[in-house]
Amino acid sequence: MTKVLFLCTANSARSLMAEAIFRQFAGDDFEVASAGTEPTKPEPGALAALEHLGVETDGLHSKALADIDLNSFDYVISLCDRARTECQALCGDQHFIAWDFPDPVTSKKADAFKKTAHELSERIKMLLLILRKKSDRPQLFDAPHEFFKIMADPLRLKMILMLQHHGELCVCQF
């Protein structure tokens, strides 16, 4: 079973919401947890935003990263720059993914928690789609060379030339 861990600093809003949303959408197909580098109690606004989305909040509580074995997770997803900086080096063979979401706790906007919960739910839906497809075809794009193997020669050559010229490419630039 694939195991996913969501991280942020306090484990009181973003990562806690991500854990609950992922659990609801994934069902029994995945195991999910969340933790914080400096955990505090769950934010009432986060719990209210989850309930607004119809996501179950029973049993949600903040957990310390120190109490979790990072090596037991297949995917570790940080939800803030600080957690990414502190935790990326600690991750061994797992896939480390960095999602930077603004902290709704420090936001002045009235709907910050609802907006964050909605954005997390959309991102998690996409992640689950990818993870489920990958489990159907586990060898699909595990490494860049696998991706290049399926390209036609002219496209492969064009991509290599673009990489050489630009050094780094992002789809948002095209």
Regions found by a protein language model. Give the residues of each.
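Phosphate-binding/catalytic loops
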Residues: 84-135
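N-terminal helix-turn-helix DNA-binding core of bacterial DNA-binding proteins
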Residues: 142-174
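Alpha-helix C-terminal capping/helix-to-coil transition sites in glycosyltransferase folds
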Residues: 70-72
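Conserved acidic
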Residues: 38, 109-112, 116, 143, ...
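Short glycine-rich anion-binding loops that position phosphate/pyrophosphate groups of nucleotides
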Residues: 12, 81-84
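Conserved active-site segments centered on acidic
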Residues: 1-66
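Long, low-complexity, charged/polar intrinsically disordered regions in eukaryotic proteins
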Residues: 136-140
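Redox-cofactor binding/interface segments in oxidoreductases and associated redox assembly factors
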Residues: 78
